[in-house]
Design a protein with these regions (language model features):
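Alpha-helical transmembrane segments in multi-pass membrane proteins
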Residues: 8-16, 39, 43, 47, ...
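Interfacial loop-to-transmembrane junctions
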Residues: 141-160
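Juxtamembrane boundary at the C-terminal end of a transmembrane helix
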Residues: 169-181
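Cytosolic regulatory modules rich in charged/polar residues
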Residues: 1-40
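Short alpha-helical transmembrane segments in multi-pass integral membrane proteins
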Residues: 72-93, 97, 102, 107-108
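Non-transmembrane, extramembrane segments of multi-pass ion/lipid transporters
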Residues: 1-3, 50-77, 141-143
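Re-entrant/interfacial helical elements at transmembrane boundaries that shape
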Residues: 38, 52-63, 138-142, 153, ...
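Membrane-water interface of transmembrane alpha-helices in multipass transporters/channels
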Residues: 25-40, 106-118, 148-149, 181
Length: 181
């Protein structure tokens, strides 16, 4: 039991080391718009949480034989809609929170709207990506002969952490160009 879990944790640990690489890639942007760093935990945890949730639901459905590996396409279509809906809900809440704090406490500066838009759009994209990754990885793990229950959710969290940073800062570069960046 320990060996099986330790192997995955070590693999995932090395995967998480890539988060520093991803953030380093956007070091200049973070330097110019430090406010972006404030939302990194919110962004990556939302993607990881949505992915883990989707992964758990698919693993359960596979275990109960409600779905089979060949049903991956049907599951993916359903999860795209779910990811967009959930991402839109969290994106709207994220934007509204930034707008409220900007109005009440005058934080985030004169470009608060663009920061809020960046966070909102990033949440939509990352929750969609997390949901898709989380729903598809159990199928991949099962197909490769691994136990999806021990590997999928942690792998999803690691994958979404690293790629979520790339998505977030990529959106920031596009949205904030000419204002904060």
């Amino acid at each position: 039991m320990i060996r099986k879990r330790a192997n995955w944790l070590v693999i995932l640990f090395f995967g998480e080391l890539l988060t520093a690489t991803a953030m380093g890639f956007f070091e200049k942007e973070i330097e110019r718009a430090v406010v972006l760093a404030l939302f990194v935990p919110l962004i990556i945890s939302s993607g990881g949480n949505s992915g883990s949730q989707a992964s758990t639901l698919v693993i359960r459905a596979l275990a109960l034989e409600e779905i089979r590996v060949r049903d991956w396409w049907r599951v993916m279509r359903r999860e795209v809609l779910a990811g967009l809906a959930l991402g839109s809900i969290l994106g709207a809440i994220g934007f509204l929170r930034i707008a409220l704090w900007a109005a009440l406490f005058n934080v985030y500066g004169e470009h608060w709207f663009w920061v809020g838009l960046t966070v909102g759009l990033a949440l939509i994209a990352i929750v969609l990506w997390g949901t898709l990754a989380g729903s598809m990885l159990p199928f991949v793990m099962r197909r490769l002969g691994f136990d999806p229950a021990t590997s999928s959710a942690p792998f999803v969290a690691t994958l979404v952490d690293v790629t979520g940073l790339l998505i977030y800062f990529g959106i920031a570069v596009v949205v904030l160009r000419g204002t904060l960046l």
